Amino acid sequence: MSLPRRAAHVAIRGYQLTLSGLVGRQCRHWPSCSAYTDEAIERHGLWAGGWMGLARICRCGPFGTHGIDLVPERLPEGAAWHRPWAYGRWRGVNAPATPLAEEVHDPLPGP
């Protein structure tokens, strides 16, 4: 792990062990915003992962998104170092597909 990535990891871990407990562990997403940012930086580097984390933190609020939101496996199409906002997903979540989402449930089954 490079020095900048390691420094970011230590800073995030420090936040998780200190301030996060004082603020209250009430993130609306899983994984938490700090864990998401840490994983994004580990997977995509400090620049891209940092922007992904910032976008996630901006979405986490009373009128923002919630639920399962995983770090993308690949960088978004069109993302480049000179267009940092393109790394982040500013709306919506990256939820895994579930078999239940495909099923149609009949609320009143027949005889």
UniProtKB/Swiss-Prot annotation:
Question: Quick check: keyword Cell inner membrane in the entry?
Answer: yes
Query: Where on the tree of life does the source sit, at the highest rank?
Result: Bacteria
Subcellular location(s) of the protein: Cell inner membrane
Query: What main location does UniProt list?
Result: membrane
Q: Which Pfam families match?
A: YidD
Q: Which InterPro entries match?
A: Membr_insert_effic_factor_YidD
This protein's GO cellular component annotations are:
plasma membrane
Question: What keywords are assigned to this protein?
Answer: Cell inner membrane, Cell membrane, Membrane
Q: How does it sit in the membrane?
A: Peripheral membrane protein
Q: What functional role does this protein have?
A: Could be involved in insertion of integral membrane proteins into the membrane.
HAMAP family recorded for this chain?
UPF0161_YidD
**The family this protein is said to belong to:** Belongs to the UPF0161 family.
Identification of the protein by name: Putative membrane protein insertion efficiency factor
